[in-house]
UniProtKB/Swiss-Prot annotation:
Signal peptide bounds: none
Pathway linked to the protein: Cofactor degradation; nicotinate degradation
Pfam families found in the cross-reference section: Amdase (PF17645)
Keyword Transmembrane helix: no
Remarks, miscellaneous: Reaction is initiated by nucleophilic attack of cysteine at the double bond, yielding a covalent succinylcysteine-like intermediate.
Chain positions recorded as substrate binding sites: 15, 80-82, 137, 167, 199-200
GO molecular function, one term: maleate isomerase activity
Source lineage: Bacteria, Pseudomonadati, Pseudomonadota, Gammaproteobacteria, Pseudomonadales
Induction / repression: Repressed by NicR in the absence of 6-hydroxynicotinate (6HNA) inducer. In presence of 6HNA, repression is alleviated.
Family from the record: Belongs to the maleate isomerase family.
EC annotation from Swiss-Prot or TrEMBL: 5.2.1.1
Name this polypeptide is given: Maleate isomerase
Classification via InterPro entries: Iso_Racemase_Enz_sf, MaiA/AMDase, Maleate_isomerase
Length: 250
């Protein structure tokens, strides 16, 4: 009998990409592995990518975890990297523990992944030491993200802030622009390129091109989240066409 897994997604209300890129990867996996997935979301309000609005949104994440645990999902993914990183260094650990406890208190214990924690873990898995980052945020928020990742033990050699404050506009950013952005960055000695430090910024269509262009492994927040979900479900973390991390090399 085919095993079916319920994927729970804690989603900013204005996010339109998490529910396309993560299902796209897991659905692509179905062509090469027997497991099947369904996708279930709960939303927390956010329209402008500003620190105050992100903090207010994060306060709603507990409700989302409880709602998704009502559906007895098998894993939960919190998809707003900057909301977690803007709350303070190492906050992904606190968030994951609290939200998992919320599922346990609802008699539906399930592992909780944050895209922030997933990206940090992915960089460790890929044995990255020196990285480059592309993010859609305004510079002050991007600096918070860069500092957060540095505190997790990585050297950030170069980074780009695309300075898009409206979250819907982030989703509309054309991923075809990403290879050109990366071409202007200093990648000398870089181990891994973080092509999108944001689950809302589309990047999946550009991953293979940037890997070919740079000769370096490329990861994104969405790819890292998908990897972490598969690991949490004790499934082989392999997805065709989703970059080095999900190639089976790790």
């Amino acid at each position: 009998m085919t095993q079916l897994y319920r994927i729970g997604q804690i989603v900013p209300s204005s996010n339109t990409t998490m529910e396309t890129e993560i299902p796209a990867m897991l659905n692509a996996r179905q062509a090469i592995r027997p497991e099947r997935f369904t996708f279930h979301s709960s939303r927390m309000r956010m329209k402008q990518v500003k620190k105050e609005e992100l903090a207010a949104m994060d306060a709603e994440s507990d409700r989302c975890a409880v709602e998704l645990s009502d559906a007895k999902v098998d894993v939960l993914g919190y998809a707003c990297l900057v909301a977690i990183m803007a709350m303070g260094l190492g906050y992904h650990r606190q968030s994951e523990k609290r939200l998992q406890q919320a599922t346990a208190d609802n008699d539906a214990l399930a592992p909780v992944i944050t895209s922030a924690g997933a990206l940090v873990e992915a960089l460790h898995v890929m044995k990255a030491k020196r990285i480059a980052i592309v993010a859609p945020y305004m510079k002050p928020l991007t600096e918070l993200v860069v500092n957060y990742i540095r505190e997790e033990g990585f050297e950030v050699q170069d980074w780009r802030a695309l300075e898009i404050p409206d979250n819907l506009a982030v989703a509309r950013h054309d991923p075809a622009n990403l290879p050109g952005i990366v071409a202007g960055m200093d990648l000398e000695g870089v181990d891994v390129v973080v092509l999108s430090a944001c689950v809302q910024m589309q990047s999946l269509p550009a991953v293979a091109k940037v890997e070919a262009q740079t000769g370096k492994p490329v990861v994104t927040a969405a790819i890292a989240t998908t990897y972490a979900m598969l690991k949490a479900l004790d499934l082989e973390p392999i997805v065709p066409g989703a970059g080095a991390l999900l190639s089976g090399a790790y």
